Design a protein with these regions (language model features):
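Class I S-adenosyl-L-methionine-dependent methyltransferase catalytic core
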Residues: 1-213
Length: 213
């Protein structure tokens, strides 16, 4: 098992997620990774938190449910908050098998094997990435109660010297699926400093809050 997940929630993101989820009684992270969503208990004591993760080989928090976000094991209207950070479609989705000593990072390299076919960590930003996330949001949003909040942590990246507007696409897609935006914030983050375009890394991520009508 491995807890060397290359894209965990950063320390500065967690309190913003907690702020945006204030008032929730039940929270789901459908892309839970190693389980840092449970850090929200420090800010929101007494809240029920569930995490869903497709890769059992991540050293996940024992409270995490192993399963597929495309087919979540809960019924409609189970949670009054969804708090999550999907993959960003950046170079962490590379499938290369790094040689010893390589400083470049990817989900595959960190896990030490190929990813599950339904793991979006396999997908570079593009049509397949967008199709996957439309399907994923379509499976997850019914779990959210009417009036519930959806908190999204997402970031853009640079590819071939051009900014890829991943965050804008998620924002527009979630709005088109019936969510109403309420708040948003840029959060300065350290980010990764290895690999291609490292000198052009975007130094912040977005946290967005939506409400289900």
């Amino acid at each position: 098992m491995s807890n060397n997940h290359p894209a965990k929630y950063t320390d500065v993101i967690v309190p913003v997620l907690a702020e945006y989820a204030q008032g929730a009684t039940s929270i789901l992270d459908p892309f839970a990774g190693t389980g840092r969503i449970f850090w929200l208990h420090e800010y929101l004591p007494g809240v029920r938190i569930e995490g869903l993760e497709i890769e059992p080989d991540w050293e996940t928090d024992p409270r995490t449910t192993i399963g597929d976000a495309l087919n979540p094991p809960w019924g409609p209207n189970t949670f009054d908050a969804i708090v999550t950070s999907p993959t960003y479609g950046n170079r962490l989705a590379d499938h290369y098998k790094a040689k010893d000593g390589s400083r470049r990072r990817s989900y595959r390299h960190s896990l030490g094997r190929d990813l599950h076919p339904n793991n979006s960590g396999r997908l570079q930003w593009g049509k397949k990435y967008r199709v996957f996330h439309v399907e994923a949001w379509g499976a997850i949003l019914p779990l959210l109660t009417p009036g519930g909040v959806f908190v999204l942590n997402i970031a853009d990246h640079i590819r071939n010297w051009k900014r890829q507007f991943v965050s804008r696409w998620h924002f527009e897609t979630l709005c088109a699926m019936g969510l109403t935006p309420e708040r948003g914030r840029k959060v300065v983050t350290p980010g990764l400093r290895d690999g291609e375009n490292r000198e052009l890394r975007i130094g912040y991520e977005y946290v967005m809050k939506f409400r289900k009508n």
